[in-house]
Amino acid sequence: MPAKRSPARRPTMKDIARRAGVSESAVSFALNDRPGVSDVTRDRVRRVAEQLGWRPSTAARQLSGEGAATVGLVVARPADALGVDSFFLQLISGIQEVLAERHLGLLFQVVEDVDAECAVYRRWWAEHRVDGVLVVDPRVDDPRPGLLDELGLPAVVIGGAPDAPHPGMSTVWADDAGAMAAVVDALYALGHRRIVHIAGLPGLAHTERRIRTLRAEAERRGLPEVRSLTTDYSDAQGAAVTRRLLEGAEPPSALIYDNDVMALAGVAAASELGFSVPGAVSVVAWEDSPLCRMVKPWLSALSRDTVEFGRTAAQELTALLDGGPARTVRVPVPRLIERESTGPCTAEA
């Protein structure tokens, strides 16, 4: 078994002083733009600090020298899709509830991709901005767990597989495979054989797990016309994919959407094309939300307590910050609530 790699070490003022050949007080004066050192020394100190990758500590800027702990959360998703995603709104609500009770801050940032997310972690680490992070949207071949372990940042992975991505990280997960199997069971019992899953972003661990489960359930039942199509989670792509499917030679009799926003857009697109829900096509949304009960027909949906999901993740991170061990915590399987948007298949098999 390979030896555990020591966390990367942040450069300090002592390192700068040693490299520049000056005292630590001179380094402090130079970096804080205070009088007491010559311009030549100030320039040399700043040059060395840049070479070493030094960044000022947020806590060091505060009068007391000891700031409250801060938790970081970076989301690499399209900003327009994220703004209407009820899952993240509820998840963050649960996270913030726990952090507020502990007087902890939340530093939140939206980025365009996982490379940018990794760059944020490196910057936060170098600047002492966060004491731990919550990692969302686990990915296939995910570079983030290894990076966070290298940096020595405590982390909790939200979602993903039951196996922790790294020994020092906690994982909070739900059984997406079991939830997908339950949806297929329900639709199959209603007579549906042409089922299409309008999935989220490709490469996300939960997206791939849902796709694999759907494929396995279809093979088990001998259903060749069951498939998944990936999207960016937006209403625009949800509607566009729905139109393309329903305008095809053999439209599906049931659609499973990976979030509520795409499901709503899909129902609207179906209506525009003259497909009634659930008469001509049944619809299931992966995430239940109040939106699912604000339209006619009310949407059948997979329901879970997403706020509690966020609370659990935040509690696990605070436990790590308190010196507790890494754990794997399973939350309840999302439960299918059958409403008005699913019904018996009326299309020819």
Where are these regions (language model features)?
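Flexible loop/hinge segments that line or gate small-molecule binding clefts
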Residues: V136-G178, V261, E287-L299
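Hinge/beta->alpha junction and helix N-cap segments in small-molecule ligand-binding domains
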Residues: P78-Q90, F108-E117, V172-A182, I198-V241, ...
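Short, well-structured alpha-helical segments in soluble
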Residues: E117-R129, A239-A249
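N-terminal helix-turn-helix DNA-binding module of bacterial transcription factors
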Residues: M1-A69, T346-A349
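Amphipathic helical "hinge" segments at domain boundaries
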Residues: W54-V120
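Flexible loop/turn connectors
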Residues: S6, V226, R244, G248-A349
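Short acidic/polar active-site loop segments enriched in Thr and Asp
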Residues: S23, A69, D131, R193-R194, ...
